[in-house]
């Protein structure tokens, strides 16, 4: 797109794009590639942890890349308000969501793209590395978002036997967790659908998670 091309044309170290209300940030690398909103929080947290040890608060569907950076991650229901509530409850200084939202408590308790930009620029300045180099040192995962029509009466407790996993989290729908993959299933608040989020090391693993769930719900 236009920003990707502009980064290449001017030889920029990084490109930033915010949403209209300035609470979410996307990044374009020095190679002119949009790297995905999931990296915004991960890179901001990496910078913060260079200076101060901290727990990090985020929602259930944020990438497990965060666990590779942070010593401890607290997961919440999806939604900025739930992340902020947990930050207040446990006095956690930094948090956010995988949609490009970074929350730094010392500034204010809300997602802020300018905070994210400043933290990522600080990371690049202190490390002397490019954005491309920084993300190459972070474990890579493939993510898929999907949805399926459902019966409103579906019982989430009945879904627990679909997968043989290491951990199940039921604070917001149901999430099945393994060391290097997960699938999160939750009802939409506005539509008769289940929203599905899945992440794994490769396409085959992600597809297997999604297909297993869909076949069970047929």
Residue ranges and their predicted role:
Residues 24-42, 66-67:
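Short Gly/Thr/Asp-enriched flexible loops that form oxyanion-binding sites at enzyme active sites
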Residues 19-20, 29-31, 178-180, 189:
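Short acidic-glycine loop/turn motifs at beta-strand connectors
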Residues 3-7, 45, 83:
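Generic hydrophobic alpha-helical segments
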Residues 20, 31-32, 40, 61, ...:
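Short, ordered loop/turn segments at secondary-structure junctions
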């Amino acid at each position: 797109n236009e920003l990707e091309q502009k980064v290449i044309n001017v030889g920029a170290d990084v490109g930033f794009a915010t949403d209209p209300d300035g609470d979410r940030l996307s990044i374009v690398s020095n190679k002119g590639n949009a790297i995905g909103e999931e990296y915004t929080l991960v890179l901001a947290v990496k910078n913060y942890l260079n200076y101060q040890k901290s727990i990090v608060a985020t929602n259930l569907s944020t990438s497990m890349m965060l666990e590779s950076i942070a010593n401890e991650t607290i997961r919440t229901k999806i939604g900025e308000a739930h992340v902020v509530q947990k930050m207040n409850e446990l006095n956690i200084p930094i948090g956010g969501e995988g949609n490009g939202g970074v929350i730094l408590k010392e500034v204010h308790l809300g997602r802020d793209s300018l905070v994210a930009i400043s933290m990522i620029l600080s990371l690049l300045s202190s490390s002397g590395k490019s954005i491309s180099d920084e993300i190459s040192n972070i474990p890579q995962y493939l993510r898929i978002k999907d949805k399926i029509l459902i019966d409103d009466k579906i019982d989430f407790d009945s879904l627990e036997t679909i997968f043989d996993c290491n951990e199940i989290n039921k604070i917001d729908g149901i999430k099945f967790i393994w060391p290097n993959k997960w699938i999160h299933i939750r009802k939409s608040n506005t539509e008769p659908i289940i929203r599905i989020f899945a992440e794994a090391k490769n396409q085959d693993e992600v597809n297997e998670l999604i297909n297993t769930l869909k076949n069970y719900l047929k």
